[in-house]
Amino acid sequence: MAIRSYRILTPDTHNRSVSGFDGRVQLDPQKKLTSGQHHCGKGRNARGIITARHRGGGHKRLYRQIDFRRDKEHISGEIVTIEYDPNRSAYICKVHYKNGDKMYILHPRGVMIGDTILSGPKAPISIGNVLPLTNMPLGTAIHNIEITLGKGGQLARAAGAVAELIAKEDRSATLRLPSGEVRLISENCSATIGQVGNITANNRSFGKAGAKRWLGKRSEVRGVAMNPVDHPHGGGEGRTPIGRKKPVTPWGYSALGKKSRKRNRYSDASILRRRE
């Protein structure tokens, strides 16, 4: 769905754009499929100490209960609505299954209201259907991919995300993820066929600082603009450089390019090529 730009009538509408909701996208969720969220002290731990900076505030939200497992095998479901979800960049779909259950799922690109979806090993190769990786042909575009069997999809869930099945060997499937990483996953794990919808989400221009504050994101102050007591980059007369060979975090650790992944993780053997 296209990005909608504002006419420049006030300073806050200059260079501002939002996701263009058309007549298909609804804003009001089904009450039984939502739950409240406790957001007291965003970015704080149990003692009230800031552990994640630049977070706080934001508009009140209801959490939509998304079915990432898609484990209703051989029970067809009909797409009833396409809805906005404030908790993620992708849109969501409300599905009515033949057995009477109602669920939310991620909206696959190209799926329309009235379409039918199916899960299971014998489901057809069609956008929105869920199958084990072993039953998919090579080159299939997929999203909402399981890492652990039965745990539900954990990879490629953002708006526009898509991975590719590039090989199958020794009961493992090789995937190329949206980040460029190539890794192995058990071929018994399931995934949804197709790409996540709302592919133009990254083209949105916030236009003003308040639009970020609505999302619960606070402004970030540069370390070089601080005092020496607050940041290793701080201090100096006027506009001075950081005074170091390489930039560091407020706590003195290397930043901007330093690999932060822990060594000797159990999943290292599954990663064939690091992300780009």
UniProtKB/Swiss-Prot annotation:
Organism: Pinus koraiensis (Korean pine)
Keyword Ribonucleoprotein in record: yes
Annotated region (Disordered), positions in chain: 225-276
Name of protein: Large ribosomal subunit protein uL2c
Keywords recorded for this protein, A-Z: Chloroplast, Plastid, Ribonucleoprotein, Ribosomal protein
The family this protein is said to belong to: Belongs to the universal ribosomal protein uL2 family.
InterPro entries: NA-bd_OB-fold (IPR012340), Rib_uL2_dom2 (IPR014722), Ribosomal_uL2 (IPR002171), Ribosomal_uL2_bac/org-type (IPR005880), Ribosomal_uL2_C (IPR022669), Ribosomal_uL2_dom3 (IPR014726), Ribosomal_uL2_RNA-bd_dom (IPR022666), Translation_prot_SH3-like_sf (IPR008991)
Domain of life: Eukaryota
Subunit structure, as described in the record: Part of the 50S ribosomal subunit.
Alphabetical GO biological process terms: mitochondrial translation
SUPFAM superfamilies per record: Nucleic acid-binding proteins (SSF50249), Translation proteins SH3-like domain (SSF50104)
GO cellular component, one term: chloroplast
